[in-house]
């Protein structure tokens, strides 16, 4: 903006006042330093600002304060006079980390007001931090280069299309884990969320829907890729972090897939145009350790509205990652079609999209299943899940377990152990059979 414009001058005055404590005399001194001379109107402005904003000084920004300056009668008279205020030097406000919002009362977040503080917290140099966060400098057309911070795996979906798993390389992954465990894990998601939260799982997600007349299941399309960098940045800013720190944290936790990778032979014909556009824009990468927690936080308004919808209908709502579940009595069953329309509309308004082909209305007379858990009378292991896991375990006993790792899990043994433990929890008798097969697997064949 022009340095003689009203906006420039009011912002400079606002920054000067914010560059120190909210004491009227001190603010007058700072305004005098910026404008080169003292003026009578400064005293009234400073007293009014101190009284109005002093109690929440750390949360006031330049934009808010500049509007007050522009509306001050003393300043307006001076601006319209023959010798209007003129900025002779700029006094920037030191970076300030604002207190967390009221809904995070009692949550202690790391104090990272500057990029230097962020770099020190992550134990990297500032220029390294810039490199890991500003990946836009890598040519977007190339499929992959040593400069990329991600490697890519193409996983086939059941419908014949594919999903791209974006796996951060070791150094970036280490930084993301620090952000996850040192910052994001401290911020609670909505209470209806059961995915990627300590002490919660698919069983706690499904259990509230046991014994209901109807269970309605929804699936969100491209859950992680739908969360673009702008939404991540807004969440980080809402936590109180200054502009530059929020931008850098956003850069560390988001990615855009190079165009060359999207048109590679293994992906070109299995990703539609809309999906390709999502991947090209900076988004939460499926495969980064920070993505699940950030996705939950970015979906907070979605959960808030859907939980409110459920309450208004006398129903129950839970979410596990991209799986949404509603359940209730006969009244909900009769209005299921209207609920589908309303849920889809709310999802769109909040930046997500329901996949209508995966929506299921499950009545009491048929099998009601959520995330592999049957909920008709009590949480139970679905027969299809039991058979599929038994087949994988049996094949692992008969041949190299690595050959069964079709989804490329980094620790396939731990993955299978988790699935078996889940089965034991849901159905001890069936789970014991799976555990017996798992114990027969020989893991020294390269897996």
Where are these regions (language model features)?
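Non-catalytic, polymerase-adjacent accessory regions of viral genome-replication enzymes
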Residues: 1-139
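Glycine/proline-rich, flexible active-site/cofactor-binding loop segments
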Residues: 153-195, 257-282, 289
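Short acidic (Asp/Glu) and glycine-rich catalytic loops that position anionic groups and cofactors
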Residues: 156-159, 320, 366-373
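Active-site-proximal segment of RNA-dependent polymerases
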Residues: 172-225, 254
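Conserved polymerase palm-domain catalytic core
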Residues: 210-321, 325-353, 359-363, 401-447
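A conserved non-catalytic segment of reverse transcriptases
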Residues: 346-400
């Amino acid at each position: 903006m022009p340095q003689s414009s009203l906006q420039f001058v009011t912002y400079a005055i606002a920054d000067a006042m914010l560059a120190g404590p909210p004491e009227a005399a001190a603010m007058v001194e700072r305004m005098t330093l910026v404008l080169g001379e003292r003026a009578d109107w400064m005293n009234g402005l400073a007293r009014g600002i101190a009284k109005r904003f002093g109690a929440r000084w750390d949360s006031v920004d330049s934009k808010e304060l500049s509007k007050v300056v522009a509306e001050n009668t003393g300043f307006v008279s001076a601006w319209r006079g023959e010798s209007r205020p003129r900025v002779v030097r700029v006094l920037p406000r030191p970076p300030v980390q604002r207190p967390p919002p009221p809904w995070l009362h009692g949550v202690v977040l790391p104090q990272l007001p500057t990029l230097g503080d962020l770099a020190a917290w992550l134990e990297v140099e500032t220029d390294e931090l810039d490199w890991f966060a500003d990946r836009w400098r890598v040519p977007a057309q190339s499929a992959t280069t040593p400069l990329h911070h991600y490697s890519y795996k193409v996983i086939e979906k059941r419908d014949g299309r594919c999903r791209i798993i974006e796996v951060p390389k070791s150094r970036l992954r280490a930084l993301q884990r620090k952000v996850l465990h040192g910052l994001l894990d401290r911020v609670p998601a909505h209470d209806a969320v059961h995915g990627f939260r300590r002490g919660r799982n698919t069983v706690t997600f499904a259990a509230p829907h046991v014994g209901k007349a109807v269970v309605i299941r929804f699936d969100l399309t491209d859950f992680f890729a739908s969360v673009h960098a702008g939404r991540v940045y807004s969440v980080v800013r809402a936590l109180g972090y200054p502009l530059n720190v929020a931008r850098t944290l956003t850069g560390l936790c988001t990615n855009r897939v190079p165009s060359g990778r999207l048109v590679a032979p293994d992906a070109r014909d299995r990703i539609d145009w809309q999906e390709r556009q999502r991947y090209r824009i900076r988004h939460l990468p499926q495969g980064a350790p920070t993505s699940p927690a950030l996705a939950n936080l970015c979906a907070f308004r979605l959960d808030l509205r859907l939980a409110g919808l459920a309450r208004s209908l006398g129903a129950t709502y839970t979410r596990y990652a991209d799986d949404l579940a509603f359940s209730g009595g006969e009244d909900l069953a009769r209005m299921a079609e209207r609920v589908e329309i309303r849920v889809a509309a709310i999802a769109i308004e909040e930046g997500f999209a329901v996949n209508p082909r995966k929506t299921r209305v499950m009545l009491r007379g048929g099998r009601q299943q959520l995330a592999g858990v049957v909920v008709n009378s009590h949480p139970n292991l679905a027969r299809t899940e039991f058979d599929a896991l038994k087949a994988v375990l049996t094949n692992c006993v008969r041949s190299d377990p690595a050959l069964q790792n079709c989804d490329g899990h980094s620790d396939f043994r731990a993955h299978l152990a988790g699935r078996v433990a889940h089965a034991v929890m849901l159905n001890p008798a069936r789970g014991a059979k799976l555990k017996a097969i798992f114990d027969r697997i020989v893991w020294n064949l390269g897996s």
